[in-house]
A protein has these predicted regions:
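A broad, structure-centric signal for solvent-exposed, well-ordered loop/edge residues
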Residues: 35, 79, 133, 164-165, ...
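SAM/dcSAM-binding transferase cores
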Residues: 2-15, 188, 203-297
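Residue-level detector of alpha-helical recognition elements and their boundaries
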Residues: 51-52, 111, 201, 250
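Class I SAM-dependent transferase core
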Residues: 2-109, 118-120, 125, 141-143, ...
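Poly-acidic low-complexity segments
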Residues: 41, 89, 138, 161, ...
Length: 297
């Protein structure tokens, strides 16, 4: 178990300082996001010490102390170091969560929930009248999330392939692994006005001896369903561990998406076409029944 060198009151101050730094790094002025990061106890979602944090050059190193105050850093903590799965950068997630424009009462599906830390942040943001569906394919991570989120009545943990969820209309969908294409439910089960944030990414060709297969090219995108189609916008660079299950891709998709990233121009994308014939020459990337294009919806 983590140890505590600080009193509960002191730890509350440390959490507030951590949340303030996270929000500032993310360049978000949304006070609800900062409050959520100040409220949720991150240590509940990191597993038992000794914790490991990511090195800048790759791999992980163990922390020499098990003091829970060390959880309140803007660093990556390993969840499954052999697979390259980590707790994520708080400031990156704060930035992406700000793009979701979450409202009290929203129904949100969190795809790739891991041990549930960002599901708990979402739980704070939607409030008691909203609901978070935390979907995680790995049974060990899902079991940890189930335990860590048990005190949150507005969260349901689902051990399933995220490519099959949600199974009903959602106000927002938040994806936490790199994909080369959106899963059908992520597009078709967004309600009008619904928002999707996902990391588009191409798997690295080489897989490190320790750690999972991360994206070699990556970009976070915001998709919003309007009356006449799907608006799309580039948020920024984002490199996540790549999808397994129903969203694994073949060599042809890897080659085509890699070529698009190398050409550049994703920052000019304005729309996502879904099961619609794209205009040749007006798209950054054309996939199977979907495309990212330069024209407004």
């Amino acid at each position: 178990m983590p140890t505590a060198m600080f009193t509960a009151d002191e730890l509350a101050v440390i959490r507030r300082a951590y949340a303030h730094q996270v929000a500032a790094t993310a360049a978000t002025t949304n006070p609800r996001i900062e409050a959520a990061f100040a409220t949720v106890p991150r240590e509940k979602f990191l597993g038992a010490p000794p914790w490991q944090i990511a090195n800048l050059g790759g791999g992980y190193r163990p922390l020499t102390s098990s003091d829970l105050v060390l959880a309140y850093q803007d660093v990556l903590f390993a969840l499954q170091s052999e697979k390259g799965v980590n707790n994520g950068s708080p400031s990156l997630h704060a930035r992406l969560l700000a793009e979701l424009d979450i409202q009290i009462g929203d129904r949100i599906t969190h795809i790739g929930a891991g041990t549930g830390y960002y599901s708990a942040i979402l739980s704070e943001l939607v409030g008691a009248s909203g609901h978070v569906y935390a979907v995680e394919m790995d049974p060990d991570l899902a079991a940890h999330a189930q335990t860590a989120l048990a005190d949150r009545a507005n969260v349901s943990v689902i051990n399933a392939d995220g490519s099959q969820w949600p199974q009903q209309e959602m106000d927002a969908i938040y994806v936490n692994f790199a994909v080369a294409r959106p899963a059908e439910p992520w597009i078709e089960r967004l309600r009008p006005g619904g928002r999707l944030v996902l990391p588009l990414g191409v798997p690295r060709l080489d897989r490190p001896p320790k750690g999972g297969r991360h994206a070699s090219h990556g970009a976070a995108l915001r998709i919003e369903r309007g009356e006449s189609g799907f608006a799309a916008r580039w948020i920024g660079a984002a490199y996540f561990v790549c999808a397994n299950g129903g969203l694994s891709i073949d060599d042809n998709e890897i080659e085509a998406l890699t070529a698009a990233f190398r050409r550049g121009g994703i920052e000019f994308v304005k729309s996502l076409l879904w099961k619609t014939e794209p205009r040749i020459g007006r798209c950054w990337y054309i996939g199977d029944q979907w495309a990212l294009c330069y024209d407004d919806v």
